Amino acid sequence: MLVVVTVIGIMAAMTLGALQLARESSREQATKATIAKLNNIILRQYDSYKTRRVPIRIPPGTTPRQSAEIRLAAIRDLMRMEMPERWNDVSDAPGLLPHIGVPLQEPALLQLYRAKYGGTNPPKNPDNFSHAKCLFMIVSMGNPEAMEQFHQSEIAVDPEDGWQYFVDGWGKPIYFLRWAPGCSSYSDIQSGNAATDPDPFDTRRVDPAGFHLIPLIYSFGRSGADNVEVENDVHFRDPNTSPNVPTTICGLSQYQANGAPVASSATGNIHNHRIEQR
């Protein structure tokens, strides 16, 4: 009798273990599917800046190199405002463009973001989900027709402020970094090599340190542990110098860490920089 009970117990444990593995696998697959949809939407918008016209007037006497630097700075700032990854991307004014000392006009999309951000229901502060909420804002306000692709199970609401965000198979936020230079070390599609994979938005190569950056969309996976560097704001001009000197698209040295893993659990993250997940 004891042997029978022992065998039944072992079989029950094996069955429960198999069920748990199946549930975890299902959650991973659901997460990959959601990230794949988000990847297509975000990259479509991101790539559109390669041919995007910017409303700037180049004054007479400007050299071709200076013109290219002005346009590159304008495109980068436009991307920051229309594809925000953090709340100060929404609240900050357009930056002054090099050589001409004037900013871009605020794009209509930024004004929509600001109306929501500064409305009667602003996001909480501090906000650990800000990168996830920015991603939802970009998709829902910048590409509203794309929302039809998502089931309600892929969306959650922060009860503290009412803001929405996409969630993974574990019900945790899916995060977003527009530029993640620090993830090059574990990315299948972002080499971090300016010589062999330069910035495609810099057609005149006026920023020799700029390399091809691809938006990072990620989940913390099974661990759920916060393990990616996101704390550093981007600056196109160094505020620590006078006069402020230009920086690369990666910004100041500390910004270049954004997207880098900060714990070993990051190896289990699910993200769009792994080819099999795209």
Map each language-model feature to its residues.
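Aliphatic-rich helix starts adjacent to a transmembrane/signal segment
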Residues: T15-A36
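N-terminal pilin/flagellin-like segments and related low-complexity appendage regions
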Residues: K32-R278
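N-terminal single-pass transmembrane signal-anchor helix
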Residues: M1-A22
